[in-house]
Amino acid sequence: ATPSPPTLYGLCSCEQPNTDGSLAYGCLAMDYIPQITSVSWKKDNEPITTGLKTYPSVLNKKGTYTQSSQLTITESEVGSSKIYCEVRRGESVWIKEIPDCKGDKVHPTVILTQSSSEEITSRRFATVLCSIIDFHPESITVSWLKDGQHMESGFVTSPTCGVNGTFSATSRLTVPAREWFTNKVYTCQVSHQGVTQSRNITGSQVPCSCNDPVIKLLPPSIEQVLLEATVTLTCVVSNAPYGVNVSWTQEQKSLKSEIAVQPGEDADSVISTVNISTQAWLSGAEFYCVVNHQDLPTPLRASIHKEEVKDLREPSVSILLSPAEDVSAQRFLSLTCLVRGFFPREIFVKWTVNDKSVNPGNYKNTEVMAENDNSSYFIYSLLSIAAEEWASGASYSCVVGHEAIPLKIINRTVNKSSGKPSFVNISLALLDTVNSCQ
């Protein structure tokens, strides 16, 4: 057979670049006799020795040969160089320049957007989003500047996402509200294929109404202290920035607390609770609520402990009944529990009927009030009951808890057959006091 030279074709993968950012070049040698000696690759005049895969030659039906070779290389390695395929047979050399596999350059559209002033104030930080849209090839560099100085932290750039041959990406900058409201200039800088684009956005000049967080600590309820083995401390943080961290400690030891809840009574509050033993609370130990946030120069701390009481005074408890003439004349009558002479002021008063708890909605307690000499306190509790229930002989108990009581709890019980309780006229002033406390 008469020798014939190879016909060379330069090939590119249909989708460039590949998902890993690499480019695939192909070299196809066809219709030659005899077989060729070698297939090699060059970048400009430099031999390429990695990323090569040359397939065995194939004898065609018409008696000629075909052979192919593939080069896998990254865009950055190619740069602006030209890629060549070189085929040898003996002393003969054939060279084919491979077409540019990088495709057309499409520079991105860069858009900056920011969160609203209301959101910045409520969440205590500003978010600036840099959207980088429709570019090719994939490789880009994103950086942020503040007043012209490169920033090292505070932003996150997402991986690129390819759709229909072009790519998109986003970069998100987070700025503390106090800093945002100081009129600084923030710049998103995008570099793509030798072209750099910058987009600027300026923080607000409106003063930030971002008051420092305020910590309020709430002790456990007196009922919990007297009746339960564990008690709950509550930390309410007002003016809390978004993402605030609230923790509890006791003498430098971290305590396991309930997850902080945001919001509380208002949109800027955080509530955190911790359960401790009642014994630890009664011992007077100090417990700390610690508030941390990136916008705070140092953590905020507040402490709480049970105050030592030196002059405990046990309450006296009496149940008073409406005037006798009212009992038979009305469908309802009132029982009043008078608790007086106690110190300190922390106390609980509730009712039971036949040893079952009465719904708190069915009775009303006044505020704890100081006696005339201001050395002790008193409180009233008013229970309204149906006359027929009283007539049936049901037993009603006023249950009082106070730390000065030896057994912590006092019960005073009354019913129709237990003997006549004291009959008193409930003054309008007392009723007004009860009603005003609801």
Swiss-Prot record:
Residues 206-308 are annotated as: CH3. InterPro entries: Ig-like_dom, Ig-like_dom_sf, Ig-like_fold, Ig/MHC_CS, Ig_C1-set, Immune_Resp_Modulators. Residues 1-99 are annotated as: CH1. Residues 100-205 are annotated as: CH2. Signal peptide: none annotated. The keyword Nucleus does not apply. Pfam families: C1-set (PF07654). Residues 309-418 are annotated as: CH4. Glycans are attached at N164, N200, N245, N275, N374, N411, N415, N425. Gene3D superfamilies: Immunoglobulins (2.60.40.10). Keywords: Glycoprotein, Immunoglobulin domain. SMART domains: IGc1. The keyword Chloroplast does not apply. This is Ig heavy chain C region, secreted form. It comes from Heterodontus francisci (Horn shark).
